[in-house]
């Protein structure tokens, strides 16, 4: 039987096209650390330069009114991974409450042993929770952790590759060696991408860089851009760190373009919590991080993909970082676990229908013996519906109208008790429908 060679050529071309059409997208998750929601070029900041993020944001679907589930890094990051709220994960604070007199930084062997035991206990809940990273790995993705990570060894949580070791006996807490990414090197990302490409394997990158987080020590060439236009040194140094973060994002994009991978890569961006620099103290916040204020809980969120996502800017619709796990799995063609209550960020009409977001605000340190008590260590719970914002604290309730008062400065609770009651009912219902997963 004589077979026409042209037939083989046609078949190879067809199979190649089919493979390209059905190939899984790569995902790069850009996660900044301690950044104010206005502090980007694409959010119209008059001075801060973020050209690389601007290009990504303007090419994708951008939600100007994104919110975190907690204005503190560890619980916020846990929500990103699990698609659950802090009161569901038992991941509410950064560190455990230590017995009186014991110090985690002590060189005393007893203190070191106690600290290690408590950190292991503190990070244990994450092992039993759903995780979009675990799900990606089980669906054939190579997964890289860089930067901040609080939950012990990332390899135990679905990462095939990790910079962080997470061992408290070796100084592991919130990222250890991983915190070198961006500030000292980008090579682990370059090497990971190159390995995945050689294996023809789809990949996910967790870029949890320790920027613009303090220390605000960006290179002098960046500080020079702001020292004469910022209102004070604290702000100038923070702004320089923001630009530094943007530069590192540009390096990732450039490498993906160099390797021909950019068009098949989805970019997702958010920040872990907000930041407003204290004017008289470098590296310290005011009325932002760890607080239920807009400068503490608001962040832009965007999803960008050259192939499938049309450029669009949403100035009104509410988005939450609880939506990110669901979105990443959906864009990869994977059904999210049923416990994830977030929506797909690519469906703005669904987010518009929801029209509300919720936030847990707990103390920095958690008493590990009191995790069954959802009110222990509670500073506030927040619901935002449309432009109305209720902050419920153990001592009272505050009501803000964010359209006319975007910095939540004017408490209107005394003037509109009916609205306070409506939003309070929504908070109660939220807690009832999102119980802890233990």
Predicted feature locations:
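C-terminal cap/loop subdomain of S1 sulfatases and analogous C-terminal strand-loop tails that border
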Residues: 275-280, 287-289, 309-310, 317, ...
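A long, amphipathic alpha-helix that forms part
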Residues: 186-193, 224-265, 308, 331, ...
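A short aromatic-rich beta-strand->coil structural motif
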Residues: 27-28, 33, 136, 148, ...
């Amino acid at each position: 039987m004589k077979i026409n060679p042209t037939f083989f050529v046609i078949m190879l071309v067809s199979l190649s096209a089919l493979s390209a059409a059905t190939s899984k997208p790569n995902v790069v998750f850009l996660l900044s650390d301690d950044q104010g929601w206005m502090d980007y070029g694409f959010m119209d900041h008059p001075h801060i330069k973020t050209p690389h993020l601007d290009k990504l944001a303007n090419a994708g679907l951008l939600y100007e009114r994104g919110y975190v589930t907690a204005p503190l890094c560890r619980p916020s990051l846990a929500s990103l991974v699990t698609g659950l709220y802090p009161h569901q994960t038992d991941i509410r604070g950064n560190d455990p409450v230590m017995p009186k007199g014991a110090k985690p930084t002590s060189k005393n062997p007893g203190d070191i042993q106690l600290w290690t035991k408590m950190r292991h206990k503190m990070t244990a809940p994450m092992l039993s929770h759903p995780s979009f990273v675990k799900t990606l790995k089980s669906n054939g993705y190579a997964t890289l952790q860089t930067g901040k990570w609080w939950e012990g060894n990332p390899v135990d949580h679905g990462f095939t590759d990790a910079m962080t070791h997470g061992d408290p006996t070796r100084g592991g807490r919130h990222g250890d060696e991983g915190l070198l990414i961006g500030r000292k090197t980008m090579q682990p990302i370059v090497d990971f991408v190159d390995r995945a490409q050689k294996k023809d394997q789809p990949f996910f990158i967790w870029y949890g860089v320790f920027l613009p987080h303090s220390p605000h020590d960006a290179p002098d060439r960046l500080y020079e851009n702001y020292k004469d236009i910022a209102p004070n040194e604290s702000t100038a140094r923070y702004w320089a760190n923001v630009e530094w973060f943007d530069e590192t994002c540009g390096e990732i994009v450039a490498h993906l373009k160099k390797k021909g991978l950019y068009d098949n890569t989805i970019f997702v961006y958010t920040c872990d919590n907000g930041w407003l620099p204290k004017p008289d103290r470098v590296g310290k916040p005011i009325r932002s991080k760890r607080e239920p204020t807009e400068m503490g809980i608001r962040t832009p969120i965007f999803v960008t993909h050259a192939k499938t996502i049309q450029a669009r800017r949403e100035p009104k619709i509410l988005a939450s970082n609880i939506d990110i796990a669901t979105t990443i799995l959906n864009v990869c063609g994977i059904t999210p676990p049923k416990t994830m209550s977030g929506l797909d960020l690519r469906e703005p009409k669904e987010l518009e229908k929801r029209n509300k977001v919720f936030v847990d605000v707990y103390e920095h340190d958690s008493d590990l013996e009191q995790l069954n008590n959802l009110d222990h260590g509670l500073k506030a719970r927040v619901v935002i519906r449309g432009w109305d914002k209720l902050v419920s604290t153990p001592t009272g309730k505050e009501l803000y109208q964010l359209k006319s008062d975007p910095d939540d400065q004017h408490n209107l609770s005394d003037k509109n008790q009916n609205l306070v009651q409506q939003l309070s009912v929504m908070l109660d219902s939220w807690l009832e429908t999102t119980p802890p997963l233990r």
